[in-house]
Structures are given as structure tokens and as C-alpha cells.
Amino acid sequence: MTKKALLGLAVALLLPITCYLMLKYASETAVDMPRHYLLDTVVTRVDKGKMITDSIWHKTANIHLQNQLGDSVSLYDKEGKIIVADFFFTSCGSICPKLTANMSKLQQSFIRGGDLRKKVDTSIVQFISFSVDPQRDSVPVLKAYADRFGVNHDNWWMLTGNRDSIYKFAFEELKVDKFSTEPISPDFVHTSRFVLIDKEYKVRGYYNGLDSISISKLARDIGLLMLEKDKTQKSAVFSEIIDLSWLWLIIVLLVIFFVLYMQSRRKLNG
């Protein structure tokens, strides 16, 4: 076998590994996932002799309230779901109707299904609107308001309950007053912000619910979070491919060694 043929054989054997590694690198670097926002602490640990720094992101605490159907519900009832939250009150004559209308359009876009629906089940998205005037916004009032905007009750809650709990949740858990250019009074949560929460109850984005560009970004980020996997766990397929890549490498080395050995024997016999 000539050197040219040997090179061709090596390329043919190494090509599957090379393609896999290139695709893996491209898939990991091509898309920027929505960032985390609320940092609790930073911890350091030693792993195999190396100092590793881990960021511990704030996990949103649970809250128990009542929805527009009169059901007692909690945030943690929606385990494994991506959540889009906002704050409103039914008697609002300024921004709230527009916020609710935009949230409704967002919900309907996922119900009908876009390109993302071909790959992922959009039923994992939950919309939650917290009333900041719960004394007036009773269950019947919320139900009438929801029906007015064509709310699908299956994955959109409008919640009422204890005012202090709602306000504490807004400021201490979702921190709606942070990363904002608009002033938000601690006495009345009147904000145009939509908050994106991932499957682990961690805040992944703040958006202007009155701005079409910001809402489009929210829709995109929802899709990205739907595709997000637990990075701490390697998939079985990935592990098998890694094992096979070592097998390919061993085969290549054996073939090259065998070819070189046969060539050396021919020279000796010649």
C-alpha cells in the first residue's frame, strides 16, 4: 500500500470522529441561552485537583394562591414547566389591558404552534398573572376578566389571595424592581414587565410586555428554554459516542500499524 493510499484510509477512518466533534462544538456554541439573573452566592470546590467556581442562582420560592376558577394552586404545582409571569389588576385603565392582550397573543401563538412545535411540546409553558389588587379582584372578577381576553384556563392562571404574600413574592422572589429603567413603587406593583422563569424556578429574563420586539425575544427565549437540557448530566447517547470514538481511534492505530508492518516485511523480503 502506498503512502497516498495509507493517508486516504486514515482520513476515511478518522472522518466520522472529526464530523462528530465539529457538530458537537457547533451545537454548543451556536446558540446563546437566556442568562441567569438573580445570584444567591458563589461557591468554590476542588474537583480532580482543580479549583472550580460555581454560581448558585436564586430558586424562586413557592407561593399559594387562588386562580380564576376558584382552585387553590401553588407555583410548585407546575413542576418542570417554563413560566411567564406578570402583575396586573382588573380595574386598571392604563397598561394592564394591553399587557393582558399581549400575554393572550403569546399564549395563543404557542397553542396554535409555530416552528418550535414541530420539535417540542409547547404544553410545558405556563402563564401566570398576579393581581396586585386582590381585595377587589375576587375569583368571579378574575374569571370575567379572563373570559374577556379569551384566556385558555389550562395553562394560564390569574391569581388572587393575600396581598402581602403577592407583594413579597414580586419584590423578594422575582425582584421586579431590579434591572428596570421604570420606577416601581413598593406600595403598588404597577409594572409592564413579563418575567421568564425556567423549569428549575430560576429567573431567566425580564421583558417589556408593551413592546413587540421585547415580546418576540421572550417567545424566542421560551423556545430555547424548552430545548435546554441538564448540563450536569451526560446523555446515554453522548457516552456511547465517546466510547465509540475511542474504538475508532484504536482501529485506526491498528490499521496503520498493520500496514506499516506489512510494508516493512515486503521490503525485507524484496
Give the location of each predicted region:
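Typically the conserved alpha-helix immediately C-terminal to a functionally engaged Cys/Sec
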Residues: 95-115, 139
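Thiol-based oxidoreductase modules, predominantly thioredoxin-like and allied folds used
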Residues: 117-137, 153-166
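Short, internal strand/loop/helix patches
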Residues: 139-191
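Thiol-/selenol-based redox modules, centered on thioredoxin-like
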Residues: 182-269
